[in-house]
Amino acid sequence: MSYKLTYFSIRGLAEPIRLFLVDQDIKFIDDRIAKDDFSSIKSQFQFGQLPCLYDGDQQIVQSGAILRHLARKYNLNGENEMETTYIDMFCEGVRDLHVKYTRMIYMAYETEKDPYIKSILPGELAKFEKLLATRGNGRNLILGDKISYADYALFEELDVHQILDPHCLDKFPLLKAFHQRMKDRPKLKEYCEKRDAAKVPVNGNGKQ
């Protein structure tokens, strides 16, 4: 099966998908386009949106739908209904945090960055710290010893927030250890080192 993932030349909404594909050693074409070129091809995509995954000749958009599609195909979606629901819940929480993050990044970076770091982020991270502790005492992955698509979403969210504030995880030992555990996975380590050396932007406006 051939895959092509089309997105802008940033991390953004596509990065958890890239991490999934890289870590699972799934071959794909990483199609990165310039923002200025998007208007001329926008009509080609469902909802006029990116990222877009081509699974053979099928086009899939919406980043969460893409992740769950891949998770079902490669058995990273939990082993039963409750596990699937649990990681869905986790990912929805990650999405909620990301909405708050992107609102600050794109709409009020200069005035809201410090209040976001000091007043909003700690409470949000505390929720994930508590939830992570419910499986295996938080000493491994979200589902314990089994990786799922939610691990890639959480890892990326923690990573971009550490760029925003390098000390944001200092009071959350389970999240900090989880982040390092994911970062040390061999394929992710190699990918992230190359990405970071290339200084790939996190967001489309250059702010991070």
Curated annotation (Swiss-Prot):
GO terms for molecular function: glutathione transferase activity. It is an enzyme of class 2 (transferase). GO terms for cellular component: cytosol. Its EC number is 2.5.1.18. It catalyses: RX + glutathione = an S-substituted glutathione + a halide anion + H(+). Hypodermis, wall of the seminal receptacle and spermatozoa of adult worms. Transmembrane segments: none annotated. Residues 1-78 form the GST N-terminal domain. Keywords: Transferase. Appears to play a central role in the parasite detoxification system. Belongs to the GST superfamily. Pi family. Homodimer. This is Glutathione S-transferase 2. The gene is GST2.
